């Protein structure tokens, strides 16, 4: 019994000694990737994710590894996860579009209201953190302008300072809204990617439901409802149906 306990603690201590920190795993994974050892690099990146870390760079590199290994569904999944953290990254968007070119389903999106599209384009032109910095800058400018309004040497200067302070307030609130909206979007689990080579979308949440259409690996969808192991989905072109949870992975 004592020998068994000793062996247990010996193995436990040995595992702690051999355990790599996330920083060491990151460096090792990057080195492996640069040597085109994509499968080994992938395992190191996954260990970092399993330890609880999440970042745009980590998801981006995971997407790259899966793409190099020709796992298109997983590649798109991780590019989409990275995109939720930084919607303005051009390299990320280019890689995502490249991966989508390898997906069999070519779905035409239903165009949104032009004003909504315009606002979203502005919102996603910067990351959530960048919008937070902008908000702080605008609020700081507002505070300085209000001081100038209070202690300005002339009525004209005070009037200009007041209007500029109000403009800074509005811009600060807008930047704060964009930052919070992106954070809220990241917290949502309402989109998913098909992981199976072929998946059937049915008219009802069971295998006996009528087959409506077929989806292939890498296709993105919005999740509307869940019943048991089935999820009601909507595609970018407006088509809806039920798909088994086993065939998809939430972004």
Enumerate the predicted regions with their spans.
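Beta-loop motif signature
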Residues: 34, 187, 194-223, 228
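Helix-start (N-cap) detector for alpha-helical repeat units in TPR-like alpha-solenoids
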Residues: 22-23, 39, 55-57, 90
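Internal/C-terminal transmembrane anchor helices
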Residues: 158-181
């Amino acid at each position: 019994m004592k020998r068994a306990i000793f062996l247990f603690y010996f193995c436990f201590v040995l595992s702690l000694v051999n355990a790599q920190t996330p920083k060491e795993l990151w460096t090792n994974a990057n080195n492996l990737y640069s040597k085109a050892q994509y499968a080994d690099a992938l395992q190191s990146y996954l260990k970092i994710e399993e330890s609880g870390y999440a970042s745009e760079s980590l998801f981006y590199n995971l997407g790259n590894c899966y793409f190099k290994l020709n796992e298109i569904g997983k590649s798109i999944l991780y590019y989409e996860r990275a995109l939720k953290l930084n919607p303005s990254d051009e390299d990320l968007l280019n890689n995502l579009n490249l991966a989508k070119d390898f997906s069999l389903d070519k779905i035409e999106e239903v165009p949104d209201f032009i004003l909504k599209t315009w606002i979203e384009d502005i919102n996603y032109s910067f990351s959530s953190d960048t919008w937070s910095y902008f908000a702080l800058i605008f609020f700081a400018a507002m505070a300085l302008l209000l001081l100038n309004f209070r202690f300005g040497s002339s009525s004209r200067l005070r009037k200009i300072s007041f209007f500029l302070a109000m403009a800074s307030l509005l811009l600060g609130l807008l930047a704060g809204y964009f930052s919070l909206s992106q954070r809220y979007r990241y917290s949502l689990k309402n989109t998913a990617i098909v992981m199976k080579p072929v998946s059937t979308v049915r008219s009802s949440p069971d295998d006996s439901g009528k087959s409506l259409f077929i989806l292939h690996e890498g296709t993105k969808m919005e999740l509307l409802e869940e019943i048991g192991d089935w999820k009601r989905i909507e595609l970018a072109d407006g088509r809806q149906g039920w798909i088994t949870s086993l065939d998809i992975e939430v972004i």
